[in-house]
Amino acid sequence: MTFKELNITEPILKAIEEKGYTVPTPIQEKAIPVALAKKDILGCAQTGTGKTASFAIPIIQHLHLNKGEGKRSEIKALILTPTRELALQISECIEDYSKYTRIRHGVIFGGVNQRPQVDMLHKGIDILVATPGRLLDLMNQGHIRLDNIQYFVLDEADRMLDMGFIHDIKRILPKLPKEKQTLFFSATMPDTIIALTNSLLKNPVKIYVTPKSSTVDSIKQLVYFVEKKEKSLLLISILQKSEDRSVLIFSRTKHNADKIVKILGKAGIGSQAIHGNKSQAARQSALGNFKSGKTRVMVATDIASRGIDINELPLVINYDLPDVPETYVHRIGRTGRAGNAGTALTFCSQEERKLINDIQKLTGKKLNRADFAI
């Protein structure tokens, strides 16, 4: 399957080919035809799957084919995303694929002067990429109306909830027209997300794309069977002996991530936590410190960790096991990138043993047991 076979129009196809892409990713192959057919989508996909293009390309195409001559642009598509970084990434993607069309787009987010954003809105745009807080601010000030929205994208919905944006979203939704196409994407599907999709989507086409388990084959994987109360001692012991420059530790909850940082601090090991309760500035600062090597150890929840993209990450530690085996694959896929060696260590308590079996079923690989003495 090629992009040409997905019935993408010439100006957009030209832009895609200029970027060096000819074959769509699995989610693009599944989602683009559905979105072009104007059906609602419930997409379950991680970042790094080509998800952004799977909603950006159909929206650009619809708007391009229906663009009136000489009329001032008004917002026809709204893309809501949780963070400034994601908003900018989506904006760049739209910029790339719409370059040979007359589609105008803009991006708004908090933490910066709103004046340039307001000026851009007043000039007229077709597609708006926004974070919930800044969108509500500018709506309340009368700078944005959502009456003409035909396409609505809610991206990284689980991360939105994790960061406490659910109330903002519930204030935005009633301002949207009833008749619109909704494209909803989330990496995980907890009950709160399912409840939201039930109220938002009309007969959606469900699209699931799981991470390739083959990507874990090159990573050395070991499991430590350990009592829950011994996990912190084991972690300290490993970090004190390890010479790895960067270590990423996964915790299932925000509370536990903070607790791990405190425990390590008492043992003289500096670390930082990144999760949804941290402010955007704090998350950015922690990420910057980790990427630059200023912070050696990062403790993260699954949702917050999506902003971490480092080629040289030699060691990943699963302090808690994830409930979903695909998440394990996604976690350990952070190491062993770009031909570098990678190791993934997993701490498994008695009550987590079933989860290990689920992981081994998914990957088709038995995890080697590691022995230890604390």
Where are these regions (language model features)?
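Conserved helicase RecA-like core
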Residues: 2-374
